[in-house]
A protein has these predicted regions:
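Internal intein/HINT superfamily modules and their associated LAGLIDADG
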Residues: 1-138
């Protein structure tokens, strides 16, 4: 009998776009849940930002535990537990927090600013090569 699919997915390495969506989300409204070995990412935004939640889901879909669901006025989803979240957890607490800036690329910054309401991600503002990498679902 084969391995459970979730265990197999824990060995999949996030691509650069996924890493930036994760970093930007964690700097914004996203949060890590669970302890070491079981950490997962929780994404939640007001239902009025449903298009944005689905955009994040499309980029992180392989790691999503379920499709976005509406709870009250919040549309949310969780990822599966993944080792990348254990690796990132120290960067989002304590003295290592400043190291996040070294990892952040323009897409991660855009996600962060969109999360906090300072920016709206729009495909037409990206250069064609950036659009292909950042905005087109894979």
């Amino acid at each position: 009998m084969g391995e459970h699919p979730e265990r197999v997915l824990r060995r999949v390495v996030p691509d650069p776009v996924q890493v930036q969506v994760i970093l930007g989300s964690l700097l914004g409204d996203g949060r890590l849940e669970g302890g070491e070995g079981e950490r997962r990412l929780h994404i939640a935004h007001h239902q009025g930002r449903a298009e944005y939640v689905w955009w994040k889901y499309e980029r992180l879909g392989i790691f999503a535990a379920h499709t976005p669901v509406l709870r009250g006025e919040t549309l949310e989803f969780h990822t599966i537990a993944h080792p990348v979240f254990d690796d990132l957890a120290p960067l989002f607490s304590g003295p290592d927090r400043k190291r996040v800036r070294e990892l952040l690329a323009p897409l991660g910054l855009a996600v962060w600013m969109t999360d906090v309401g300072r920016l709206r991600l729009r495909a037409e503002v990206f250069l064609p090569t950036q659009r292909a990498a950042a905005l087109v679902a894979r």
